[in-house]
């Protein structure tokens, strides 16, 4: 069995949309976790949140950005720099990990809140030729997604894979920590 390696990665946080931008801030001793006075029903807690100003600056980098939710745009932006340098074939897997996807859309539309629809919108943006593989198992989903992608490649189901792990600060997610 051939070894499987991670050969490209990216990270999108309040520090920026690259590993280097995040590393530079960490080396300086900076933290993206800060006190949030109020968010939904919660008051005075600490979390990492991508502010609206940063989001609006990033949003302009995505074509037809008005048809995507905030979380879908985060997923597209995080993947864009590594997919732009690659080819997606019918043997390329797309594994997406999220706790609840677009759960904040539930009050507007069941369809928008569907994790399946959420994953398909991101997959369609990049023209993946396979159905997205969805892993939804709370905080450990990202590690499971990497493991599953690795196993699919080892089993010769796919030649390569893109793994996207993402969640957003929402009332639902915060309630789980309360």
Spans of model-derived segments:
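Conserved "HGTGT" condensation-loop signature of ketosynthase/thiolase-family condensing enzymes
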Residues: 1-132, 137, 151-154
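Active-site-proximal beta-strand/loop segments in catalytic clefts of secreted hydrolases
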Residues: 9, 165-166
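Glycine-/small-residue-rich "gating" segment that lines the acyl/pantetheine channel
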Residues: 15, 147, 169-178
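Solvent-exposed, non-transmembrane amphipathic alpha-helical segments
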Residues: 42-46, 142, 178
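Short, well-ordered, mixed-charge alpha-helical segments that flank or form enzyme active sites
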Residues: 102-106, 141-144, 168-173
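Active-site-proximal alpha-helical scaffold in enzymes
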Residues: 133-165
């Amino acid at each position: 069995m051939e070894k499987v390696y991670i050969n490209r990665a990216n990270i999108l946080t309040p520090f920026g949309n690259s590993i280097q931008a995040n590393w530079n801030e960490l080396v300086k001793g900076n933290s993206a976790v800060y006190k949030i006075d109020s968010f939904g029903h919660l008051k005075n807690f600490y979390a990492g949140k991508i502010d609206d100003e940063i989001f609006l600056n990033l949003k302009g980098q995505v074509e037809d950005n008005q048809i995507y939710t905030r979380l879908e745009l985060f997923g597209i932006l995080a993947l864009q720099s590594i997919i732009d340098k690659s080819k997606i074939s019918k043997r390329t897997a797309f594994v997406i990990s999220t706790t609840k996807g677009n759960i904040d859309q539930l009050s507007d539309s069941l369809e928008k809140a569907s994790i399946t629809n959420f994953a398909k919108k991101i997959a369609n943006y990049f023209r993946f030729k396979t159905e997205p593989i969805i892993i939804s198992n709370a905080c450990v989903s990202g590690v499971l997604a990497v493991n599953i992608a690795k196993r699919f490649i080892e089993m010769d189901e796919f030649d390569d894979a893109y793994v996207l792990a993402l969640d957003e600060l929402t009332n639902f997610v915060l309630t789980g920590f309360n």
